[in-house]
């Protein structure tokens, strides 16, 4: 079998997989809009969307339309964007740090963003999504600066970067706990703790617009550096030998993943393991080339996060679980498998 035939078959496989993933994502989002305390038939969900797009004019229950457009569709779309963003960050960091256990929170950026967002909520610095996002960005930048200081900027090694990220996480988690315990009321503390474990209950269309722009721009930057990421898989020396400006490419990608993570944390809290699990599965299915891996991880991460949000609302209905609890139930066994395989290599 010639190389041209193999390449054609691989292209057909990738195209078919992408189309199937997009269709599955649309179906999962529709399911996410359908389920809840008020169950909405799936055909009503599709008609509500097609009516809004001007494709149909099917009369629908106004309560259903209000629930779909005012609450659930924006929630499902934000969940999809957050899952895609976390998976992209995980794929990038696993290559940059050459570590199978790296994920978006390894640099302490999530903990820093949580501290900034919690400070805005508890101290009443501002109101609305803009203030929350600004607080999260400030906290994420502080955590990133702390890690950069400990690792000597962009020249720090992979091991030093991971250790600095652990230190930053512990520091900012402690600051968050202190802020909540000394400044929040009992009800406010409960609400903040639930949010910190991951929740999409408060997101609306403005949050979707912001996270969509950030994730798409972040994906574009990462795809631009996809060849460099392929080289980083073999180590910094191999990347440098190919003419890649290692310190500056690392810095650009670290900043990109930090901004994506901060945006997600400001809207949904800390949701772990998506950035760990998804890139590994996609790498196994589609190979290590990052131009394919990043897109596959984004689609799979979006699907997984919407499913996790659905499960969080259904497992103990009518109450809701934090989304982070659901992703941990999936991620912890996978984490154990990675450690076991690493030990036996």
In which residue ranges do the predicted regions lie?
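Alpha-helical transmembrane segments in inner-membrane proteins
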Residues: 1-345
């Amino acid at each position: 079998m010639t190389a041209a035939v193999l390449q054609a078959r691989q292209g057909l496989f990738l195209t078919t997989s992408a189309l199937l993933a997009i269709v599955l994502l649309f179906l999962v989002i529709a399911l996410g809009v359908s389920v809840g305390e008020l169950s909405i038939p799936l055909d009503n969900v599709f008609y509500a969307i097609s009516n809004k797009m001007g494709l149909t004019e099917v009369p629908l229950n106004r309560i259903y339309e209000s629930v779909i457009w005012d609450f659930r569709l924006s929630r499902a779309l934000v969940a999809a964007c957050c899952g895609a963003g976390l998976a992209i960050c995980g794929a990038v960091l696993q290559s940059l740090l050459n570590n199978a256990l790296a994920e978006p929170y390894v640099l302490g950026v999530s903990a820093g963003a949580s501290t900034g967002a919690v400070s805005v909520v508890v101290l009443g610095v501002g109101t609305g999504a803009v203030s929350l996002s600004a607080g999260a960005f400030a906290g994420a930048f502080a955590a990133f600066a702390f890690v950069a200081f400990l690792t000597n900027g962009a020249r720090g090694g992979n091991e030093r970067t991971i250790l600095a990220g652990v230190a930053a996480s512990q520091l900012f988690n402690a600051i968050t706990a202190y802020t909540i315990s000394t400044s929040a009321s009992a009800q406010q503390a409960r609400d903040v703790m639930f949010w910190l474990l991951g929740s999409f209950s408060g997101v609306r269309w403005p949050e979707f617009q912001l996270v969509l722009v950030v994730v798409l721009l972040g994906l574009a930057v990462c795809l631009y550096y996809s060849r460099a990421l392929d080289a980083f898989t073999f180590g910094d020396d191999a990347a440098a030998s190919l003419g890649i400006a290692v310190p500056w490419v690392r810095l650009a990608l670290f900043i990109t993943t930090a901004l994506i993570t901060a945006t997600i944390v400001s809207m949904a809290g800390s949701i772990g393991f998506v950035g760990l699990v998804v890139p590994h599965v996609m790498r196994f299915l589609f190979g290590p080339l990052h131009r394919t891996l990043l897109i596959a991880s984004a689609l799979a991460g979006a699907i997984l996060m919407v499913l996790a949000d659905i499960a969080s609302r259904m497992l103990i209905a009518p109450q809701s679980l934090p989304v982070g609890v659901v992703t941990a139930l999936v991620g912890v066994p996978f984490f154990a498998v990675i450690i076991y395989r690493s030990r036996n290599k």
